[in-house]
Amino acid sequence: MSVWISLIGIGEEGLDGLAPALKTLIDDADVLVGGERHLAKVPGGDAERLGYDNGFGAGLDEIESRRDRKVVVLASGDPMNYGIGAMLSRRFGIDDMEIHPAPGAFSLAAARMGWSLPDCETLTVHGRPADVLNLHMSPGTRLLVLCRDGDSPAEAAALLSERGYGDSQVTVLEHLGGDNENRF
């Protein structure tokens, strides 16, 4: 089987951050799959649109039913790092797809903090309970935590305090790589 799924990582800058060849893949797609915020970054076009804001697993059958078409799946940043890339490759096989990652949240956050990624613990509480952080808290550890919403940083800070790390510096970064990038 030839490649029929193109998995494209996009950043906050949307289409402006993509190489021309990736924009062409999106323009030529028969089916465009993504979360609401991903699809909103691609205005217009004639492609059928499939959203997956309520969980991606159920969308796999929808994608499978379009095997005879050019399918582009949009994801945040690097879809192979806590993203949907592994789920897609397990289901469809790497021979059916091509993966085009963009800089992910961890790379961008490490760059903003001036930290080397190998010197950090990278974790996500997106779709996971915040107490997963407990396994990684130790003196001097640098944690880069991908959060699910605006409440997650406060939950992480509360866990730090409960574990005796109340003096830790917590930096919140949002909309990395976009016009609304912010640091708190």
What do these predicted regions represent?
Residues 107-115, 180-184:
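Glycine-rich, charge-decorated loop segments at or immediately adjacent to ligand/cofactor-binding or catalytic sites
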Residues 92-97, 115-119, 163-168:
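A short alpha->loop->secondary-structure connector
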Residues 96, 119-124, 140-148:
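Flexible, glycine/proline-enriched loop segments at strand-loop-helix junctions
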Residues 110-128:
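Generic detector of solvent-exposed, compositionally biased contiguous segments
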Residues 90, 115-118, 136-142:
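Acidic/polar active-site rim loop that often engages polyanionic ligands
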Residues 2-7, 20-23, 69-71, 138-184:
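A contiguous loop/helix-start segment that scaffolds small-molecule binding in enzyme catalytic cores
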Residues 86, 90, 111, 158, ...:
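Short, well-ordered alpha-helices that flank and scaffold nucleotide-derived cofactor binding pockets
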Residues 1-108, 126-137:
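Class I S-adenosyl-L-methionine
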